[in-house]
Amino acid sequence: KKNKIYKSDLVSTFPNNKKLNLTIYTNENNEKITTIYSENPKPLLSSYKFIKGFEGGILDFYSVQRDDVSESVIKISDFKIQEVPVLAKLLTLASLQGIADLLTGEGIRFDDFELKFTSKDKLMRIDELYAIGPAISIMMEGYIEKNNLISLKGTLVPATTINRTIASIPLLGNILVGK
């Protein structure tokens, strides 16, 4: 209707037999809902210049567009990133898993990634970004102005620091981390 998508379902398979599902529909409040599920997220992430050397993973994407503003969440589980900044590589050396990841050349492993962002016109505001892995965790926020400026601030934390912090909590630390 009026050159707008009101309902679309795409079920597809990559050449490696991994699934890709895309759903777009307009709800009763005239909000456009987009969902993507992919067992092969690399082709979907290749246009993001700040994500390089991505391998593996399963991607879930959910977006609601109201008027000209979209609020979105990307979740990715069980993946590796091969090209990371030098500081992140140094911090991964603080754990045995990080050393193993770097020595194999396969990249730094992450168990979970979540990105919550809002887009309007050419501005993407990153409300929350986190990636948690056995060697390092990353938390960020900021914004990306299309074809112009990227401003991100956040924290890189070696996993050993997180484990020590949790371990120092009486009783709870013994249960979660052990001795």
List PLM regions with ranges.
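Surface-exposed, gly/pro-biased binding rims or lids
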Residues: 157-179
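Solvent-exposed beta-strand/coil patches in large extracellular/periplasmic or lumenal scaffold regions
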Residues: 1-157
